[in-house]
Regions:
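The alpha-helix within a helix-turn-helix
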Residues: 33
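A short, conserved structural fragment
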Residues: 51-61
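Short, cationic-aromatic polyanion-contact patches
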Residues: 28, 61-77
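Short helix->loop/beta-hairpin flanking segments within DNA-binding domains
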Residues: 1-30
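Short, hydrophobic-biased segments on the C-terminal half of alpha helices
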Residues: 44-48
Length: 77
């Protein structure tokens, strides 16, 4: 996992909403792509890396919008 993936994770955690003690976020990939000035394929690869590491979990995915559950690193320690 590289610095971009970690930055995306921190951004998703900052943008997330606390719902029943869990962090969730609903964002189109294009919003993340514009924030980091990258294309959607690059962002998709980083999101896949975050999923592989267990830092995020896709709850709902429809076209280019996804609802993610964000695992807080502090909760895992």
């Amino acid at each position: 996992m590289d610095d971009l993936a970690w930055s995306i994770y921190e951004y998703l955690l900052d943008e997330s909403t606390d719902f029943q003690g869990e962090h969730i976020v609903l964002l189109p990939i294009i919003v993340i792509a514009r924030k980091f000035d990258r294309n959607h394929r690059t962002i998709s690869r980083r999101l896949s890396a975050l999923r592989d590491e267990g830092l995020i979990k896709t709850i709902i995915k429809k076209d280019y919008v996804a609802l993610y559950h964000i695992n807080d690193q502090e909760d895992n320690d």
